[in-house]
């Protein structure tokens, strides 16, 4: 149809040029010629009166009779020139248009009315090709150039009308189509892949990277993380939903988390304060500790010697460990690490289990008690017997 449009345009242009040759010529005034002849007659009469012997030249005198009625020439209204007779190309064009209208009416018939035989369609096609060829020949005979602009890469036929240059080839506009959906691309934008043309929709659907979150094609900016591609607005914390900033992200079980939520959810907790351990830490008692949190559970002093005592899951210094265990010497108040003597509900270093009066060591284990103090028998008798 594009070839037909181009041929019609050339034919119309040639018809307009032919019509311009029939121009309207303005008629001469009615009495212009008669007035000119009368003036010449009068002039010739006056010249004949002159005396050839008179040395003085005779001047011509023109008279005008004002009583005569003024005569004006009348200009006729221009008339349209009759249209030129139709050429054989125009007649053939009319026949072609009628034939096309008939074919279009037949195509619009409902499908359930039955398809026409293939031979009839081929006859119409052959007839149309023949008429197009004849029209092209007539235009050439009229001097109208019909040189093709190349051959269509799809149908391999000459291109006379509109042409599209793409992929290093020439195409009829209706033949330059998307490789996938077969829709006409025409002069619209398209994408090329492996020498084939695709409309933007199909190209993105087939070849654009997919967002790992929404699975939709990524058309603009793409973010690559965790061996996947994402829309920038879809790469956010799996817990709080905030988009990651310059601080980056942490990965756990193939899910991204912001630093705050990752540490709160997955970082080891301090055995003292139960907060996430972020930087320096101590490992003791099968858990981790902030250095400032690993102290005695009673006096909160750090373990400068590097040793501690564990009781009920908490660290203690030696003194408070023995105090809670009840293993402090009742005499000196220091922890008992070796042998001990238990008496009066207390524990003593052997050397500190002595008489409260004479300080004699009660090594034999025989003693007397008075007011929570230990005495040997002689001192007890001396001090408390009547």
UniProtKB/Swiss-Prot annotation:
The modification N-acetylmethionine is found at residue 1. Pfam families: LIM (PF00412). A motif (LD motif 3) lies at residues 92-103. Residues 33-44 have a biased composition (Basic and acidic residues). Gene3D superfamilies: Cysteine Rich Protein. Keywords: Acetylation, Activator, Cell adhesion, Cell junction, Cell membrane, Cell projection, Cytoplasm, LIM domain, Membrane, Metal-binding, Nucleus, Phosphoprotein, Repeat, Transcription, Transcription regulation, Zinc. One of its GO terms (molecular function) is metal ion binding. Signal peptide: none annotated. Residues 150-209, 210-267, 268-327, 328-386 form the LIM zinc-binding domain. Residues 12-51 are annotated as: Disordered. Transmembrane segments: none annotated. The modification Phosphotyrosine is found at residues 22, 62, 72. GO terms for biological process: endothelial cell migration; negative regulation of B cell receptor signaling pathway; substrate adhesion-dependent cell spreading; transforming growth factor beta receptor signaling pathway. A motif (LD motif 1) lies at residues 3-15. The modification Phosphoserine is found at residues 19, 81. Belongs to the paxillin family. This is Leupaxin.
């Amino acid at each position: 149809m594009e070839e037909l449009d181009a041929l019609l345009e050339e034919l119309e242009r040639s018809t307009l040029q032919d019509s311009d040759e029939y121009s309207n010529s303005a008629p001469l005034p009615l009495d212009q010629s008669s007035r000119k002849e009368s003036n010449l007659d009068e002039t010739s009469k006056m010249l004949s009166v002159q005396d050839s012997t008179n040395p003085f030249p005779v001047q011509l005198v023109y008279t005008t009779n004002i009583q005569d009625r003024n005569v004006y020439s009348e200009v006729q209204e221009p008339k349209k020139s009759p249209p030129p007779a139709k050429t054989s190309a125009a007649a053939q064009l009319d026949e072609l248009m009628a034939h096309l209208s008939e074919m279009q009416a037949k195509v619009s018939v409902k499908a359930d009315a039955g398809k026409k035989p293939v031979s009839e369609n081929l006859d119409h096609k052959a007839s149309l090709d023949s008429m197009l060829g004849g029209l092209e020949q007539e235009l050439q005979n009229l001097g109208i150039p019909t040189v093709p602009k190349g051959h269509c890469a799809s149908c391999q036929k000459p291109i006379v009308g509109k042409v599209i240059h793409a992929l290093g080839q020439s195409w009829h506009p209706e033949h330059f189509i998307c490789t996938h959906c077969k829709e006409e691309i025409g002069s619209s934008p398209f994408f090329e892949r492996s020498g084939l043309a695709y409309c933007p929709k199909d190209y993105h659907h087939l070849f654009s990277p997919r967002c790992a979150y929404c699975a939709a094609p990524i058309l603009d900016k793409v973010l690559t993380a965790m061996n996947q591609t994402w829309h920038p607005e879809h790469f956010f914390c799996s817990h709080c939903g905030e988009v990651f900033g310059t601080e980056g992200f942490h990965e756990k079980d193939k899910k991204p988390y912001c630093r705050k939520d990752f540490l709160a959810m997955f970082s080891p907790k301090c055995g003292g304060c139960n907060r996430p351990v972020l930087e320096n830490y101590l490992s003791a008692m099968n858990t981790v500790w902030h250095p400032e949190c690993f102290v005695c559970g009673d006096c909160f002093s750090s373990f400068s010697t590097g040793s501690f005592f564990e009781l009920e899951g908490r660290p203690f210094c030696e003194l408070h460990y023995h105090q809670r265990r009840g293993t402090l010497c009742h005499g000196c108040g220091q922890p008992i690490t070796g042998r001990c003597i238990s008496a009066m509900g207390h524990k003593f270093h052997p050397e500190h289990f002595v008489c409260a009066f004479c300080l004699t060591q009660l090594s034999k284990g025989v003693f007397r008690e008075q007011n929570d103090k230990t005495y040997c028998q002689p001192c007890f008798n001396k001090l408390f017997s009547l």
